[in-house]
């Protein structure tokens, strides 16, 4: 395996090539990429946690420093103005010296407002990519060159194809997240509350709650029926039945996004259902290959859900085909099979069919699917099927012609467990699929 230094150099070559292409297409001279700024809470002097512009961290693994700027033209060495104030109130990150810094021209920026005097005087043909349009206007960037849609679409489309450097970073993020999942599982087995399980996860990963790529979902019992449950009860429930953990990690700005579900009683019906969802998830991943639409895999898993609903007698006296046709599987798995993953957890361009931004929406029957692209080598996606017992989604089925097929007694018995989700992160290769999560032996 090449060193991170070599991988990064090749990664930069790829970004430079993409930059040359997008500048030529839109007749631009350069891209000015802003890391972002701190924004204060309304009527307060405390800022919100800083979240870096993902287009900025695509170039350099600087994720915690606002007021930084990159100027790239696809030919010359990228220039990074690194914010380095004299400040005794707050910690100041030193000028970076790492595996990547030889490839970047790094200039200290002591005062954020001084960037105007550092940039080229002629800015009429430079595109600003960043979260603060007002700042770009003050720098005399024309309004039509502030986050121009065509440029953003082009950059987003090709972000789906990960470089070897990006894949290496994502594998490292996996390792960190797997450590967290193992620690959280131990905390669950010891009877901890959601709040304390989350602390165990953060300790094992070395992350603060503002460092994780998304808010950890730490759901005990019926809380697992809330897809994005983030409340974190301080008290452990009187009876531990189930635990769903959806939590990730970051490495150099790249995300991992893993989910596991455990049953307190390994001999319960719920534990058997977890086992079967896990087996079907792995079976689906085993069929994945380049050249197939992600939509197809989503539909295929609804067929697998139908099989499990019949096997576990949750839905009875109706064929699997009829179940999928009538969308009886829908209330049990109301989300998509997964999404693109990378610099962002729900990575960009999941619906984009080409580098001009052509959009293909999710099928009307499955509106929450986050990706409609044909899979290609170097794409990274999550595969995260689930079966849930969500009363608000089941209510419409309690009446009508299909109600008789629902085993309501079995469903009521399973509702206190909330639901199941199992999520791995996979890389599409030319001749197969790499399951980064299972490669680390996370059961």
Curated annotation (Swiss-Prot):
Which species is this UniProt entry from? Answer: Cronobacter sakazakii (strain ATCC BAA-894) (Enterobacter sakazakii)
- The protein's name in its UniProt record: Xaa-Pro dipeptidase
Q: What does this protein do?
A: Splits dipeptides with a prolyl residue in the C-terminal position.
The cofactor required is:
Mn(2+)
CC per GO annotation:
cytosol
Q: Does the keyword DNA repair apply?
A: no
Binding residues annotated for Mn(2+) 1, in chain numbering: 257, 339, 384, 423
Q: Which NCBIfam families match?
A: PRK13607.1
The alphabetized list of GO BP terms reads:
proteolysis
> In the record, what lineage is assigned to the organism producing the protein?
Bacteria, Pseudomonadati, Pseudomonadota, Gammaproteobacteria, Enterobacterales
